[in-house]
């Protein structure tokens, strides 16, 4: 039920539909002869896209999320494994129909996972995730990654797949059941930088200790490359709404250890 509700909520949080919601309210206000409400909604429907396109606002929220955890400097202490969270694969249906494993704009999760596997070849590399779609079709995320690794001739006994999780918290719970991490163990966690706060909160809530966040797939730089862009602004707001709402809901439902997890001093 939680998974279904979260996917339904994501439709409401899509920034592209917000002006249309406001225009619908304006239409209803006109029917009810609420002229002030009608004018306010029309004004917001016009102004909101301009507000979203103002990058210091839209990308500023995303930058806050992406800066919560720095890229770690891996020291000489042993590593017990690497976990790569799903969300980097493309359409499972297209992958199945075309016979080619699809990746999306978050493919850095996969490539960094493979890079870390080269750096630490003697520890498990775990790809976590089944599908984040409400109505899944075609290959699962695990199947897509497995096929890609086969194409690259990288099949290896130390590459494992957690094949059942549908969201971040299930990633944490199911990976823990699969790997049975011991107290004091150190696992590198790879996911998109904006997704890392919710991921760390979920793993800690699921009982993980010693997780080393390794953020990738940055959507913002250290400064704004321009002041205004509809495309970049709406993309940033999509991530902002998704992650901040997810952080709040996860915290309220006990699926995160903190409202906005961040790096801790060792």
Regions of interest found by a model, annotated:
Residues 218, 224-228, 233-266:
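Extracytoplasmic/luminal low-complexity segments enriched in Pro/Gly and acidic/polar residues
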